[in-house]
């Protein structure tokens, strides 16, 4: 059987494999196992059954999502920049990109830099690399074990500049290699799963929390929270974006207050009310 791409029907994680025996994301403590056993979807089945949409969030920012829901259902963010600046930056990826979504990406100028925070945000990175062949696909080195579906061209240690004012920062904690992308120009922090944002039906953020494992309510240790704080304290931002939410209500000062509140208590998962 030749190598091909398969998506886990439970979490959406993609593998380049013969016939996957299991899913490394689901077998990890941070995610739930499928109740009815393993089921892996070949790319052709996913392509036939799924569509998606591209939504402009700001002048220079687009959000790509997949419908119907696939796996964890994350968002692929696209920061639009000129070719002179190094081209567009794609951070995280939607679970799958339809032909129409890929056409929209082409119309917006393609992808010059590609990166993601951690495995829950990888989505269909392999598709974006295959379609646009950006010179940089950056993943922090401690998460390389999860990257067999695509080829990492720019592993890094603590920080990596994707362009002037666009810097990846290693945060760890939730995953050993978790990283955040700071957009200094627009004052945004693409924070991965550093923060979980609860939102109401209107999309307003209501609570914020930090977890080692969201599904299992496993808290972070104080040392892990301090890792987050050390990164956040040095950055200027007015909004955070996770693989799942856009939270313009959460800026640097509030993020620090949330972390300081967590550090003032024994390790626990506490949803900080906004």
Language model features with spans:
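Metallo-beta-lactamase
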Residues: 2-22, 28-32, 45-59, 88-97, 126-273
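N-terminal juxtadomain amphipathic helix
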Residues: 2-66
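Conserved beta-strand hairpin/beta-sheet module of binuclear metal-dependent hydrolase folds
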Residues: 50-101, 179-193
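Structural signal for conserved beta-strand scaffold positions within catalytic alpha/beta enzyme cores
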Residues: 63, 116, 138-139, 154-155, ...
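Short glycine-/acidic-enriched loop or helix-start segments at secondary-structure transitions
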Residues: 73, 101-102, 125-126, 200-201, ...
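A general structural motif
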Residues: 86, 110-111, 134, 236-238
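Active-site metal-binding motif and surrounding structural segment of the metallo-beta-lactamase
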Residues: 98-142
């Amino acid at each position: 059987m030749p190598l091909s791409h398969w998506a886990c029907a439970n979490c959406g994680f993609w593998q380049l494999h013969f016939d996957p025996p299991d899913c490394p994301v689901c077998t990890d403590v941070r995610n739930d196992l499928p109740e009815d056993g393993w089921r892996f979807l070949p790319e052709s089945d996913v392509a036939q059954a799924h569509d998606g949409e591209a939504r402009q969030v700001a002048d220079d920012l687009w959000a790509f999502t997949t419908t119907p829901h696939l796996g964890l259902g994350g968002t692929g963010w696209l920061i639009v920049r000129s070719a002179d600046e190094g081209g567009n930056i794609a951070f995280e990826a939607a679970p799958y990109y339809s032909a129409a979504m890929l056409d929209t990406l082409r119309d917006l100028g393609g992808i010059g830099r590609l990166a993601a925070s951690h495995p829950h945000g990888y989505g269909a990175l392999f598709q974006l690399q295959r379609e646009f062949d950006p010179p940089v696909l950056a993943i922090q080195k401690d998460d390389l074990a999860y990257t067999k579906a695509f080829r990492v061209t720019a592993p890094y240690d603590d920080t990596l500049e994707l362009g002037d004012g666009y810097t990846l920062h290693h945060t760890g904690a939730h995953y050993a290699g978790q990283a955040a992308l700071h957009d200094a120009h627009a004052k945004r922090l693409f924070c991965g799963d550093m923060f979980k944002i609860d939102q109401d039906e209107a999309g307003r953020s209501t609570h914020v929390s930090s977890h080692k494992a969201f599904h299992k309510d496993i808290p972070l240790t104080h040392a892990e929270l301090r890792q987050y704080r050390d990164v956040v304290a040095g950055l200027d931002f007015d909004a955070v974006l996770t693989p799942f939410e856009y939270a313009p209500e959460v800026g640097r000062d509030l993020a620090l207050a949330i972390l300081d509140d967590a550090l003032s208590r024994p390790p626990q998962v506490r949803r900080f009310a906004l």
